[in-house]
């Protein structure tokens, strides 16, 4: 069995990462994609590796020669086929240039921008099925050609973006762009149809389109070989590269890279997020249905102005609209408000770091808390106010991140004491939903 990689493309969407090299030379965690691929092929005992090259081909050849030789290729031969018109053609023509190789042996077909767990390569090679397309059950982050499988894993349909329907995603399997093709399949079906398709539609097409035609005609007996979505990733742009580095980082590095993303974990469906303030029970099904029902209007219509939003918020919370300011999340409101605060501000620590970071015109002083329980009392607050002659007190209730909570009667006592001292209370109840409704300082 041999392997064939299509590596002639320019990889324009990767920008600076492909200015001086090819897509398969892009580094993922300090190693080029081509290195990952060759190492996996060597371990799989592949005896010949053919690359169809074009853009920056000499640079790629030199790079491979600098990394691999007889001592670490385990007898695997590397051959190159040049696509001299790589900038005017698409991968259907690159594959056509390798037709003689496809006719001579069973082939593992790879694309140069896919990083994968070597185990899935071993598994597809060991499979008794002769003709396989590696696929993953569709997930929201995926993009590109999808397949439909029957109960016996036969591919009965291939869909491009034009025919993709979000309503049918539970039936879709995304192509991984790794195939196992027998020389009989290539001889009887694939090569003849590649030739015919190019004559009819030209060379600026995709080889998967021919597989789509074969599937439509019920020819070729191509089956789906299912793998998990976290075992591979296709790298088309810098955002993809960042995700791939997360997925394939050494275990010790994964947490650091994940934390640097600060959210967006929906791109990693296998991750369960216990760090960010997300509610696994939200939204209720009824609310979600209502949002879906009105999504078209919400998407197309211009949003209400601040006056109308204040009026609606006041209705919900039973507060006069002139006492409400609506913002794009708490961080925006905190930044705007804190810039107007002057003098000294007393804060229990640890606290939500967005506040002290935004007090650009105010000096912050610490209200000490019990280091074992993180508790503090009204008396603890007043002691610091008097000692430091504080002008403001910041209180988050329940506190973030400690969860400490002052009851309503304690809050009113604190308000009376601060009023006598002419000290302003900055009061944040962002997390009041974690307490019972009767504990909030307002009624609604």
Regions found by a protein language model. Name each.
Residues 1-3, 172-260, 266-270:
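Conserved alpha/beta core of the MobA/IspD/sugar-nucleotide pyrophosphorylase nucleotidyltransferase superfamily
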Residues 339-395:
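PLP-dependent aminotransferase-like
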Residues 1-19:
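N-terminal nucleotide-binding beta1-loop-alpha1 segment
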Residues 289-328, 332:
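Conserved N-terminal alpha-helix of the aminotransferase class I/II PLP-enzyme fold
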Residues 1-5, 31-105:
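Conserved N-terminal catalytic core of the sugar/cofactor nucleotidyltransferase
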Residues 246-301, 388-389:
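N-terminal "arm"/small-domain region of PLP-dependent enzymes with the aminotransferase-like
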Residues 123-127, 375-389, 401-444:
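Active-site pre-lysine segment of PLP-dependent enzymes
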Residues 117-201:
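Conserved core of the sugar-phosphate nucleotidyltransferase
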């Amino acid at each position: 069995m041999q392997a064939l990689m299509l590596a002639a493309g320019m990889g324009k969407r990767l920008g600076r990462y492909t200015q001086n090299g090819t897509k398969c030379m892009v580094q993922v965690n300090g190693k080029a994609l081509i290195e990952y691929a060759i190492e996996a092929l060597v371990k799989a005992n592949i005896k010949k590796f053919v690359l169809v090259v074009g853009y920056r081909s000499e640079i790629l050849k030199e790079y491979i020669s600098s990394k691999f030789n007889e001592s670490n290729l385990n007898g695997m031969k590397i051959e190159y086929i040049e696509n001299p018109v790589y900038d005017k053609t698409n991968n259907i023509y690159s594959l056509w240039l390798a037709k003689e190789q496809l006719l001579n042996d069973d082939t593992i077909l790879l694309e140069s921008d896919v990083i994968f767990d070597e185990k899935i390569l071993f598994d597809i090679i060991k499979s008794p099925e002769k003709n396989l397309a590696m696929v993953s059950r569709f997930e929201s982050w995926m993009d590109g050609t999808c397949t439909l499988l029957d109960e016996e894993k036969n591919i009965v349909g291939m869909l491009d973006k034009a025919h993709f329907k979000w309503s049918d995603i539970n039936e879709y399997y995304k192509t991984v762009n790794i195939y196992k093709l027998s020389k009989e399949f290539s001889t009887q079906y694939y090569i003849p149809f590649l030739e015919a398709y190019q004559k009819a539609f030209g060379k600026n097409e995709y080889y998967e389109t021919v597989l789509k035609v074969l599937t439509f005609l019920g020819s070729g007996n191509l089956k789906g070989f299912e793998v998990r979505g976290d075992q591979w990733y296709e790298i088309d742009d810098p955002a993809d590269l960042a995700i791939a580095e997360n997925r394939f980082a050494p275990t010790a590095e994964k947490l650091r890279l994940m934390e640097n993303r600060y959210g967006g974990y929906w791109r990693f469906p296998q991750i369960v997020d216990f760090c960010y303030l997300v509610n696994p029970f939200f939204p209720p099904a009824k609310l979600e249905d209502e949002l879906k029902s009105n999504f078209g209007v919400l998407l197309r219509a211009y949003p209400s102005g601040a006056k109308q939003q204040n009026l609606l918020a006041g209705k919900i919370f039973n507060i006069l609209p002139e006492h409400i300011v609506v913002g794009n999340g708490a961080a925006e409101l905190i930044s705007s408000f804190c810039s107007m605060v002057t003098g000294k501000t007393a804060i229990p620590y640890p606290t939500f770091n967005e506040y002290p970071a935004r007090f650009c015109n105010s000096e912050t002083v610490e209200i000490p808390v019990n280091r074992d329980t993180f508790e503090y009392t009204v008396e603890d607050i007043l002691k610091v106010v008097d000692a430091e002659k504080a002008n403001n007190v910041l209180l988050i209730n329940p506190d973030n991140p400690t969860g400490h909570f002052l009851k309503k009667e304690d809050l009113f006592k604190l308000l009376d004491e601060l009023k006598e001292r002419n000290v302003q209370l900055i009061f944040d109840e962002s997390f009041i939903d974690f307490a019972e409704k009767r504990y909030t300082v307002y009624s609604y």
